[in-house]
Amino acid sequence: MSIGKGECLVLSGPSGTGKSLVLRAIADLIPHEGDISLDEKLCTRAKPEDWRHDIGFLPAESQWWFDSVGEHFKQFDKNLFRQLGFDESVLKWEVTRCSTGERQRLALIRLLQQQPKALLLDEPTASIDTENTRQIEKMIKEYQQQHEIPVLWVSHQQEQIKRIANRHVMLKNNQITEQSL
């Protein structure tokens, strides 16, 4: 399976078919076989710390280790925060005050500030409302087009797949069963 620059490939399929495992293997979070390349450089034979920062991984539920939102950000990119509906005051918020949608939008900002060369998105809008979903989709598409990066997105939502995918791959029993444009 390969993904071109600026392409959004969506993986879908029944629960338990390995969609999230594919993302975790690419992000080198689990042992795997096969080769992974980014910008024509073979990653799997290099040290993970040499390339892992180039891959941005956003899980369905983001991790928050500190109490305040501001402790999670080394820098404040006004444009990214504004595009997702925040101003500087959000840095003073307690993480527990944030809704699930706000946490996902903040996690996306945190990820994009790292300027990844590829995005791995594991159902990033699965448990959030329509407004937050559309904001996240729009931001990812804009970033992807601006930086011409590949995006591998796991989704179960058929309408979302139609909106975001350049290509769609269905998995069943840990195998690719169908591909479409």
Q: Locations of the language-model features?
A:
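Hydrophobic anchor residue at the start of the ABC signature
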Residues: 108
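Q-loop/switch helix immediately C-terminal to the Walker
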Residues: 54, 61, 66-80
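Catalytic Walker B motif of ABC-type/P-loop ATPase nucleotide-binding domains
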Residues: 119-123
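Conserved ABC ATPase signature
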Residues: 94-98, 102
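Conserved ABC transporter NBD signature motif
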Residues: 34-43, 51
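H-loop/switch region of ABC-family ATPase nucleotide-binding domains
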Residues: 154-156
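Helix-to-loop junction immediately C-terminal to a conserved catalytic motif
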Residues: 27
